[in-house]
Regions:
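Glycine-rich anion/phosphate-binding loops
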Residues: 84-92
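Short, acidic/polar
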Residues: 95
């Protein structure tokens, strides 16, 4: 049995789906407020639901019964949308409990090491780094291309419009969440000890580079606007809750760029990663609103 936390987010769902496709038993911890459509989508994979809060010992024991490993996606590139939650106390309780048990493998996906803008995601990453867990794998995932190159984050490619954060010239090694989920699964069964891996895409590209890729694919010129660094900082400063602040913090980091982390090798888990060029080629583009 594999316990997956953060199953209400895009990455957590993909981990559950892939594990079930391999015939693996999966227990998915989900928040009680999870939207019905996500519940049904996750239920269709055949996972075992575990909606109980993890703040008390009885719930933790029940969640970890017959579990061989935990894959935690709570502190990854969240929130994808405002409806998602991040229960830091539950995440901490589970991590500490698996450490006490000693025999469980703990695999956590979190934000890159270079991120410095304070948020619950960065704080959780730092706690993972400081945890003396006997069998822990930390996966530092770069920006998810499926999230940041979407209309919800200002990249409205179906209508050839792009709102770039900052000057758009800073490079990031964007990665597919599908590749991240596959690497997390391939880490299962690894021997004890602490391992850290950087999950970066194969290319360091700026937001302006990405716009050019889409313009070439669509044969259209994008209308490009920019959100200044001052405006991004103001959004962060006025954030009223941890989730909103985490979203604003990620925008600041996106504007700064996040090139590949050359100090942490991924060679021990060979996988042909999705390039941005390949990702763009797979997208279906809606026709322009004013087309005949």
């Amino acid at each position: 049995m594999i316990l997956v936390t953060g199953a209400d987010n895009r990455l957590g769902y993909e981990v559950c789906r892939r594990l079930r496709a391999k015939g693996q038993r999966v227990r998915a911890w989900v928040p009680r407020a999870m939207p019905p459509n996500r519940i049904e989508r996750l239920r269709a994979t055949g996972v075992e639901f575990f909606p109980a809060e993890l703040h008390n010992p009885a719930a933790l024991v029940a969640a970890c019964r017959d579990v061989e490993a935990v894959i935690s996606t709570d502190a990854a590139m969240l929130p994808i949308d405002p409806s998602e939650t991040f229960d830091r106390e539950c995440a901490r309780s589970l991590r500490d409990f698996t450490h006490i048990l000693g025999g469980l493998q703990f695999i956590c996906v979190t934000v890159p090491r270079r991120f410095r803008t304070k948020s619950v995601l960065v704080e959780e990453r730092d706690e993972y780094q400081g945890c003396p867990h006997a069998n822990q794998t930390i996966l530092y995932a770069n920006f998810f291309m499926e999230t940041w190159l979407s209309p919800g984050f200002g990249f409205d490619y179906p209508n050839a419009k792009a709102e770039l954060l900052g000057d758009g010239a800073q490079r990031s090694a964007m990665v597919s969440y599908k590749d991240v989920s596959e690497v997390a699964i391939r880490c299962l069964g690894r021997d004890g000890g602490k391992v850290e891996l950087a999950l970066d895409g194969p290319e360091d590209l700026s937001q302006l580079d990405v716009v050019h890729l889409f313009e070439t694919a669509l044969g259209r010129t994008f209308a490009v606007t920019h959100v200044s660094a001052d405006a991004l900082q103001a959004e962060y400063d006025k954030a009223a809750d941890p989730v909103t602040r985490a979203r604003a913090a990620l925008k600041i980091e996106y504007a700064r760029g996040c090139p590949a982390d050359g100090h942490l090798s991924r060679k021990r888990i060979p996988l042909e990663l999705t390039s941005l060029r390949n990702y763009v080629s797979t997208l279906t583009y809606a026709a322009p609103a004013n087309s005949a």
